């Protein structure tokens, strides 16, 4: 049974880490473990600026009885570059606004296979493009499908936190959940959340460094990008017209279907040769 009194987050904000040493020199992965790759000074500056922008967005867009009492709860990947990103982002907020943070291993980067020799990784990534980005498993590492499984587990835990008010949110406050993670992990999160297909996942472009995307609770009771982001932005992310239309429909509850479980696009893809009615009808 759904808890009628549970405090749904007003926003769920997905953010990629700032510029890292690995982003400017792929050779760094050959000598430094992926989880220890640091931010550059530019990455730190990006994170500080993103924190200011995030606070401004939340504070100016919050409204209603709970608007002035908005609070933020952070989930962060345990990698050095995400942890440092959060420290810099946090400088944009006061302690009053931040009610908690949890280091969460399940939102870490895709495992590309221990130390990554640049020449070998170039060949491996070319193979991935031919095989398919979602199902290709890196030697000694993970596929995006593996990441999907652990992100699915994280989502279940996150919603249990919401159901049981483990964030300890005052009912008079507006809750914002911020997930500081990685590019592929964030795209996988969205694929799980919106029940996108593998083909739709493979359309998506990566987040920029310290880019954050805002899912806000619409009047329909569903989360959508269309409140904070334009159609042009979503096109730049690689979303199709159908995916964008779905986001728009989530704002006010005008959706004809609730997921790709019953979407006519996907029904036609699998069952286009079926008769419209039973013979005996």
From Swiss-Prot:
Pfam families the record matches: His_Phos_1
Active site, renumbered: 17, 109
Listed name of the protein: Phosphoglycerate mutase-like protein AT74H
Record PANTHER family: BROAD-RANGE ACID PHOSPHATASE DET1
SUPFAM superfamilies, per the entry: Phosphoglycerate mutase-like
Entry-linked InterPro entries: His_Pase_superF_clade-1, His_PPase_superfam, PG/BPGM_mutase_AS, PGM-Related
Function text: May play a role in carbohydrates metabolism.
GO molecular function terms listed in the Swiss-Prot or TrEMBL record: catalytic activity
Family matches, as SMART domains: PGAM
Similarity field: Belongs to the phosphoglycerate mutase family.
Xref: Gene3D superfamilies: Phosphoglycerate mutase-like (3.40.50.1240)
Phylogenetic lineage: Eukaryota, Viridiplantae, Streptophyta, Embryophyta, Tracheophyta
């Amino acid at each position: 049974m759904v808890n009628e009194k549970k405090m749904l987050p007003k926003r769920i904000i997905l953010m990629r880490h700032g510029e890292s040493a690995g982003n400017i020199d792929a050779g760094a992965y050959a000598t430094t473990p992926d989880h220890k790759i640091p931010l550059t000074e530019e990455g730190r500056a990006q994170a500080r600026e993103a924190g200011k922008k995030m606070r401004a967005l939340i504070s100016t867009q919050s409204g209603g009885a709970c608007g002035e009492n908005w609070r933020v709860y952070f989930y962060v990947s345990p990698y050095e570059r995400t942890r440092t990103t959060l420290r810099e982002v946090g400088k944009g907020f006061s302690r009053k606004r931040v009610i908690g943070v949890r280091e969460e291993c399940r939102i870490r980067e895709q495992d590309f296979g221990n130390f990554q020799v640049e020449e070998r990784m170039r060949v491996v990534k070319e193979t991935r493009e031919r095989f398919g980005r979602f199902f290709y498993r890196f030697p000694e590492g993970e596929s995006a499908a593996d990441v999907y499984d652990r992100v699915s587990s994280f989502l279940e835990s996150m919603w249990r936190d919401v159901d049981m008010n483990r964030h300890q949110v005052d009912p008079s406050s507006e809750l914002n959940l911020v997930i500081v993670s990685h590019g592929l992990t964030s795209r996988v999160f969205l694929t799980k959340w919106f029940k996108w297909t593998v083909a739709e996942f493979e359309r998506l472009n990566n987040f920029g460094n310290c880019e954050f995307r805002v899912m806000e609770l619409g009047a329909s009771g569903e989360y959508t990008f269309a409140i904070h982001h334009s159609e042009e932005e979503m096109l730049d992310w690689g979303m199709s017209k159908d995916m964008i239309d779905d986001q728009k429909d989530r704002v006010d509850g005008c959706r004809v279907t609730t997921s790709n479980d019953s979407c006519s696009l996907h029904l036609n893809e699998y069952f286009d040769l079926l008769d419209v009615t039973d013979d005996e009808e």
